[in-house]
């Protein structure tokens, strides 16, 4: 059986491990920023300075990282084969 790809967990873990600062927008319009220290199925622990906030995921509207996050390499174009090995050296 193929391994399931969980985008949310990979995204949050990448932000946590690489210590990327994020802006978190809540559904009520409140905005906060900091570093993700931990997360589980229901919550995200955000740290800003010496303050920690435990935010419920259902209250989060958007998470914006301060730098680009690439979770998977972009698809590479297939190499063009202009010459076959037989054509070379003739």
Swiss-Prot record:
**Keywords from the UniProt entry:** RNA-binding, Stress response
| Any Gene Ontology CC annotation | cytosol
Reading the lineage from the top rank, the first entry is Bacteria
**Any one Gene Ontology BP term:** regulation of translation, ncRNA-mediated
Matches recorded under InterPro entries: Hfq, LSM_dom_sf, Sm
Q: Name one Pfam family in it.
A: Hfq
Indicate yes or no for the key word RNA-binding: yes
Q: Which GO terms describe its molecular function?
A: RNA binding
Which segments constitute the Sm domain?
A: 9-69
UniProt record similarity statement: Belongs to the Hfq family.
Q: What does this protein do?
A: RNA chaperone that binds small regulatory RNA (sRNAs) and mRNAs to facilitate mRNA translational regulation in response to envelope stress, environmental stress and changes in metabolite concentrations. Also binds with high specificity to tRNAs.
Q: How does it assemble?
A: Homohexamer.
What is the protein name given in its UniProt record?
RNA-binding protein Hfq
Recorded source organism is: Thermotoga sp. (strain RQ2)
């Amino acid at each position: 059986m193929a391994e399931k790809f969980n985008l949310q967990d990979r995204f949050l873990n990448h932000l946590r491990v690489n210590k990327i600062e994020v802006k978190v927008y809540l559904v009520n319009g409140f905005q906060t920023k900091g570093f993700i220290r931990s997360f589980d199925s229901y919550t995200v622990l955000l740290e800003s300075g010496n303050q920690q906030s435990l935010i419920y995921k259902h209250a989060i509207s958007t998470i914006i990282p301060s730098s680009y996050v690439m979770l998977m390499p972009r698809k590479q174009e297939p190499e063009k084969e202009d010459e076959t090995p037989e054509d070379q050296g003739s």
